[in-house]
Amino acid sequence: MGRKIIYSILFFIITILIIILLIYGYFKIIGLESRVPEKKENLYSIRTEKYLDRKVFIVTPNEGKTSDEVILYLHGGAYVGEIEMEHWEFIGQLITDIGATVILPDYPLAPKYRYTDTFKMVEPLYKEIVDKVGAEKLTVMGDSAGGGMSLALVEKISTETNYKIPSKTILISPWLDVRLTNSEIEKVEKYDKQLNKETLKLAGLAYAGEDGINNYLVNPIDGDISKLK
């Protein structure tokens, strides 16, 4: 009971600190649902569907190159930030270049939700996509925190389920260790104009929740990659 009380107090403090950081601009948007950009409809079509009480954006090309490839894209944002315009720009470029369908889940965000809540959405979504199109046509892709989540998802699929892993897993500057234990971080942090080690630690703790910070789904650097390709 004592440990649970300590955890509850700790995560209450973390939540307050993240809100303060939000006010001072460290995180643009926190825990809010993502919105569809208004000026992109001429480039691609966006269909919004409800999935387990969350939104999933299904993005397809309006013209030009098309393919039967599907990309499950998990956006970055330190596990607390919503889908940004930069993500939409990148997805638009993907669609233009390869003509794939991009499935973009608006997954649950910390500090309101934990990694367990997030995986309750993204894992069944992955399985549903595989059931519909096959793993051989699926790419799992993500940037930053979404890159870490992408690797963790594929590790989980490969070790804890009978589902096939995707044909490709593409990680863009993935956040693989929310504990930030790499000693090289100290050397490069002063050159980083956007990210701050201490605020990232708070975000990582909020995402990890009471299960602690050492689960491979939070730190996919600790996961089993032997079956990945």
Where in the sequence are the language-model features?
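N-terminal Sec-pathway targeting helices
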Residues: 1-18
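Short Lys/Arg-enriched alpha/beta "domain-start" segment
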Residues: 28-32
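Alpha/beta-hydrolase superfamily serine-hydrolase fold, recognizing
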Residues: 18-25, 36-229
